[in-house]
Amino acid sequence: MAAAIASSLIRQKRQARESNSDRVSASKRRSSPSKDGRSLCERHVLGVFSKVRFCSGRKRPVRRRPEPQLKGIVTRLFSQQGYFLQMHPDGTIDGTKDENSDYTLFNLIPVGLRVVAIQGVKASLYVAMNGEGYLYSSDVFTPECKFKESVFENYYVIYSSTLYRQQESGRAWFLGLNKEGQIMKGNRVKKTKPSSHFVPKPIEVCMYREPSLHEIGEKQGRSRKSSGTPTMNGGKVVNQDST
């Protein structure tokens, strides 16, 4: 008796659940058009426009313009004084007799008409000349890193600052090494002397991106030999008069 009552109650509960589920599914199937509030014609027009938007909304492939590339060279710069210009990892610039030193490799990047940037390959720093004629190394490319490249009458190449020169005479300031292989102040170097004469010895031709030009004195990522001090190159006083 108790079992029959329990069975009957179970069947009633099951039927109630099934009827409720049927009503819910029926209500889902009967989505009355009247609830939309729009006519059949309006819905048709909206459907057409949605398809049009979908088709026209496809993104066309963007054609990227090729980045401007500059053809430069990896080279060694051999001075008539008998030294190769070199840049150490800490940014120190001097000369060495060791032709095979990796520190003598420089990127010569054209940045204007007969104007180049001289960048140490290993240090990734630029050779620069400040307003007092001292050479230093820079993390960023500034106007002080631009050098005019000229061929002298004896077929040696000379590099002069594009930014600074003698105010009275207008004489250019040159990159130079003295007889001891030390760098010289640019305003002490004369283009007629061996100290300013270099022979580029190209290793390979490379393509470079144009360096981003920064303002002079802009904060650099790493501390380097600062401009405006006579104790450049790790505390060695630059010999200003030796040629």
From Swiss-Prot:
Specify the superkingdom: Eukaryota
Main location per the UniProt record: nucleus
Decide whether keyword Nucleus is in the record.
yes
Keywords in alphabetical order: Disease variant, Epilepsy, Growth factor, Nucleus
Query: Which InterPro entries does its entry note?
Result: Fibroblast_GF_fam (IPR002209), IL1/FGF (IPR008996)
**GO molecular function annotations of the record:** growth factor activity; heparin binding; sodium channel regulator activity; transmembrane transporter binding
Map out region (Disordered) in residue numbers.
1-39, 216-243
What does the entry state regarding organ or tissue expression? Brain, eye and testis; highly expressed in embryonic retina, olfactory epithelium, olfactory bulb, and in a segmental pattern of the body wall; in adult olfactory bulb, less in cerebellum, deep cerebellar nuclei, cortex and multiple midbrain structures.
**Motif stretch (Bipartite nuclear localization signal):** 11-38
One Pfam short name: FGF
Q: Which CDD domains match?
A: beta-trefoil_FGF12 (cd23328)
> How does the annotation summarize its subunit structure?
Interacts with the C-terminal region of SCN9A.
State which disorder the record connects to this protein: Developmental and epileptic encephalopathy 47: A form of epileptic encephalopathy, a heterogeneous group of severe early-onset epilepsies characterized by refractory seizures, neurodevelopmental impairment, and poor prognosis. Development is normal prior to seizure onset, after which cognitive and motor delays become apparent.
Q: Report the sequence similarity comment from the record.
A: Belongs to the heparin-binding growth factors family.
Entries under PANTHER family matching the protein: FIBROBLAST GROWTH FACTOR
Q: Function, please?
A: Involved in nervous system development and function. Involved in the positive regulation of voltage-gated sodium channel activity. Promotes neuronal excitability by elevating the voltage dependence of neuronal sodium channel SCN8A fast inactivation.
Q: Could you identify this protein by its name?
A: Fibroblast growth factor 12
User: Which gene name belongs to this protein?
Assistant: FGF12
